[in-house]
From Swiss-Prot:
InterPro entries: PS_antenna-like, PS_II_antenna-like_sf. The lineage of its organism: Bacteria, Bacillati, Cyanobacteriota, Cyanophyceae, Nostocales. Belongs to the PsbB/PsbC family. IsiA/Pcb subfamily. Keywords: Chlorophyll, Chromophore, Membrane, Photosynthesis, Photosystem I, Stress response, Thylakoid, Transmembrane, Transmembrane helix. It comes from the Bacteria. GO terms for cellular component: photosystem I; plasma membrane-derived thylakoid membrane. This is Iron stress-induced chlorophyll-binding protein. GO terms for biological process: photosynthetic electron transport chain. The chain crosses the membrane at residues 25-45, 64-84, 89-109, 203-223, 240-260, 309-329. Under iron-starvation forms a complex with PSI trimers, where the trimer is surrounded by a ring composed of 18 IsiA subunits. The keyword DNA damage does not apply. Chlorophyll a. The gene is isiA. GO terms for molecular function: chlorophyll binding.
Length: 345
């Protein structure tokens, strides 16, 4: 992290992973622990939503955010978009909670049994030791991340084509996708209007392309060292890598917010409520419901779209903050300058 030529910076507990920035073993342990917490939240909140679910009220009007996703994936849904079986939701919640325990055990193992620094490890683990200015090793680690992301995209393809199918709002039922779109002109033609996709074939075909491209990129980064132009263009430091990551998350958040707000194929009306409209409150944009609901109630679509939008906004601020620090900008100088102005006035 940026220390402004002070190598003895001490980070308190609230600084998170900055405490382990130069300890690759503990850094991995922290990441596994965060994955455990995320998975625990997913499982526990699925159960919480299941305990509050009312079969006589439209799912999109109950303020749920996880059960609609599971229904869209075709779990527990019958003809007409009716929820006919909630047991799959219970099982999925349980699997996530069990997985969180396994991940938590892995985090404890890395923290208390593994080496603090992977350069002291033996065997294959030593290969994953990294330094923030080592572009080659960062490329290797990036490659492995891309492999997992690609596998995740292809899992959706497998669910759509082989494991029961997805919910199709155009026929109000779950169906298997047998002929995904593979025409690259159709898939890449969505670049300017991606949120207008209106058929599962294009959605599944897009995931095939994304999954394969991610896997190809993963293999590339594992086998090929960063090229000269990339080393010249990019800054390789903990602060810079963090800023790149936050920028990517911000972009994904803005895309998800817009897609969720307007698209009714990936976010069916039956489970999320009708599309939203953009409104402004004292120049601040937000997505508003287009149906009348009791005071204080909002559709699942409104919750998801607005949450993604505002979180993406703050991730963008984090990206800019850390990007400026990565190039050497010291925010303390701003504070000192303002204090000097106040003193002189």
């Amino acid at each position: 992290m940026q220390t402004y030529d002070n190598p003895k910076v001490k980070y308190d507990w609230w600084a998170g992973n900055a405490r382990f920035a130069n300890l690759s073993g503990l850094f991995i342990g922290a990441h596994v622990a965060q994955a455990a917490l995320t998975t625990l939240w997913a499982g526990a909140f699925t159960w919480f939503e299941l305990s509050r679910y009312q079969s006589g009220v439209p799912m999109g009007e109950q303020g749920l955010i996880l059960l609609p996703h599971l229904a869209t994936l075709g779990f527990g849904v019958g003809a007409g978009g009716q929820i006919v079986d909630t047991y799959p939701y219970f099982v999925i919640g349980a699997l996530h909670i069990i997985s969180s325990a396994v991940l938590g055990a892995g985090a404890l193992l890395h923290t208390f049994k593994g080496p603090e620094n992977l350069k002291d490890a033996t065997g294959p683990a030593r290969e994953f030791h990294f330094e923030w200015d080592d572009a080659n090793k960062l490329g290797l680690i990036l490659g492995h991340h891309l492999l997992f992301l690609g596998a995740g995209a292809l899992l959706l393809v497998a669910k759509a084509m082989f494991w029961g199918g997805l919910y199709d709002t155009t026929i109000h039922d779950v169906r298997v996708v047998t002929e995904p779109t593979l025409n690259p002109f159709i898939i890449f033609g969505y670049q300017t209007h991606f949120a207008s996709v209106d058929n599962l074939e294009d959605v599944v075909g897009g995931h095939i392309y994304v999954g394969l491209l991610l896997i190809f990129g993963g293999v590339w980064h594992i086998l090929v060292k960063p090229l000269a132009w990339a080393k010249k263009l990019l800054i390789f430091s903990g602060e810079a890598i963090l800023s790149y990551s936050l920028g990517g998350i911000a972009l994904a958040g803005f895309v998800a917010a817009y897609f969720c707000a307007v698209n009714t194929l990936a976010y069916p009306v039956e489970f999320y409520g009708p599309p939203l409209e953009v409104k402004f409150w004292y120049l601040r944009p937000y997505f508003a419901d287009t149906i009348q609901l009791p005071y204080g109630n909002y559709t699942s679509r409104a919750w998801l779209a607005n949450t993604h939008f505002f979180l993406a906004f703050f991730f963008l601020q984090g990206h800019l903050w850390h990007a400026l620090r990565a190039i050497g900008f010291d925010f303390k100088r701003v504070e000192k300058a303002l204090s000097a102005v106040e003193t002189s006035s």
